[in-house]
Amino acid sequence: MNALNRFADPFYSIMRFIVGLMFACHGLDKIFGTFAGKTEALPPLMMLGGWVEIICGFLVAFGLLTRIAAFVASGEMAVAFFMVHAPKGLIPYVNKGELAVVYCFVFFYIFLRGPGSWSIDAMIGRGRTAAATTL
């Protein structure tokens, strides 16, 4: 098991990068219709959510202000689940809220674990990385 531990932080950073970019893509599509081509007017709360997704997604992806951005993103997904999906039932598979739940918990994990060693936060010495706290 110890032989695999050396890969844990690099793969955590890769996961953080991919999740952040995917989240930012959701926001870009919501605001600008980047991928689906939709450009309809959004209610103000959805517009705010789209901007949170773009900003927090890129911050998490590149590991800048990681804990703050991940906490905000996790909270946004909790709000999205309870405002949009939960009225249709509390089971995520039934109410189509699986992605909101997964994002909520992944971002909360990133908030708890921190940026990792492959991040701008680690490069500028902001906060302690998970590798530094486990050694």
Predicted regions and their residues:
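Extended, low-polarity transmembrane helix blocks
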Residues: 1-32, 38, 46-51, 55, ...
